[in-house]
Amino acid sequence: MTAKAEFGVRVPVSGPLASKENILSTTQFAEKLGFDAIWVHDQITWSREQNSHHVSSGSVEAVVEGANPDFYEAVTTLSYLAGQTHSIKLGVAVIVLPLRNPVVIAKQLMNLDVLSGGRLLLGVGTGAPLVGKSFETVGVPFESRGEITDDYLSAMLAIFDQSPKSEYSGKYAKFSGVEIFPKPFQKPRPPIIVGGLGRALRRAALLGDGWIPANITPAGISEGIGRIMEIRKKKGITTKELIVGNEIFSSIDKDSSIARGNASATIASYAKSIGRGSEEVTLVGSPSEVSKKIESYVGAGVNMFELKFIYKDMASLRFQLEVFASDVLRSFR
């Protein structure tokens, strides 16, 4: 019997095909086809150069020289989509937490969870070197992003969990006796899924409900899960079910050569921009090939996928969503 997993689709909030219309149509089509979630990601500043080479929605072939590097903000976009959908989960992977005021973002996210009827999936992370300009612009020291993230996330947990009054005293966030409502629809809170590798594993173990890495092999997944569980055990934390995500490039076609041809340039460009990544850590191929790759990840412990489809136009995305839904999705239900 095939193990179960949830599947979500990254919608084009960035990249050459980013637009209000494309974000909404992709979300509603994914819901219609039975996908479990849609996902957005988060940046404050985003340059034309980044928009041309670091493409995680669309494809490099779709890039138009000189076009504005539109990047739709995560929380407001999910709030808009909450009002345009019925049941599909609304995920962000990940909020770059050091760039946000922890009290304000906690309030916004609680509100979003209530308005959506408990559909929020909350990914949090520190931000990578690629987004250093955002830290400079906002006035946050990039080298301190890890400890800021831990502090801010702890502060947010105090707001989510404590009632009627919340208090927290940390290095970067302090408040006492504050009443912040409404509290989240989901109890005790939306699932907190920590992005990243290395030190992020400790953050996921101690402050999160899950972990979502990217560009990682099944063996890397198994190793990361083992490390998280080891940290929890040493801290005396009763092991609870762990959400294990995988943010992964995807390209599917009945003809595997077409799927690979569709994806190769974008995967190569993205790998060059971050210094790692290859087809080995993607879901590229025919439905049967993609299903086998998914099985290997599920066997390693993944129970939730954020699919970053590669597509030159919206017709290509719709086609791939249909193929995935009909030939792959149902096998993991």
Stretches found by the model and what they are:
Residues 1-333:
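Active-site-adjacent structural elements that line small-molecule/cofactor binding pockets in enzymes
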